[in-house]
């Protein structure tokens, strides 16, 4: 019975806690999906010999 008041107080504290991220977003908070998109685009460019060799001659892997 002694733990009951403590339990109630903890429940009240949890209910009043913010349910969202209270930190402000910065420029570094970029979604992971944009990193994946950039990676896919880079790999597609590197694996496409026509596009890679003509746009960036230094990255041509095929002779």
Curated annotation (Swiss-Prot):
Annotated domain remarks: The cysteine framework is V (CC-CC).
Report the subcellular localization: Secreted
User: Record keywords: Secreted included?
Assistant: yes
Q: One cellular component GO annotation, for this chain's record? A: extracellular region
Lineage, top-rank taxon, reads: Eukaryota
User: Pfam families of this UniProt entry?
Assistant: Chi-conotoxin
Q: What is its main location?
A: secreted
Specify the signal sequence span: 1-22
Query: Could you tell me the keywords of this UniProt record?
Result: Amidation, Cleavage on pair of basic residues, Disulfide bond, Secreted, Signal, Toxin
Q: What is the protein named?
A: Conotoxin Pn-B01411
Q: How is it modified after translation?
A: Contains 2 disulfide bonds that can be either 'C1-C3, C2-C4' or 'C1-C4, C2-C3', since these disulfide connectivities have been observed for conotoxins with cysteine framework V (for examples, see AC P0DQQ7 and AC P81755).
Which residues are part of the propeptide segment? Answer: 23-49
Q: In which tissues is it expressed?
A: Expressed by the venom duct.
As stated in the Swiss-Prot or TrEMBL entry, residues carrying the post-translational modification Isoleucine amide are 62
Q: Which organism is it from?
A: Conus pennaceus (Feathered cone)
Q: Which family does it belong to?
A: Belongs to the conotoxin T superfamily.
The keyword Nuclease is annotated on this UniProt entry: no
Return one GO MF term: toxin activity
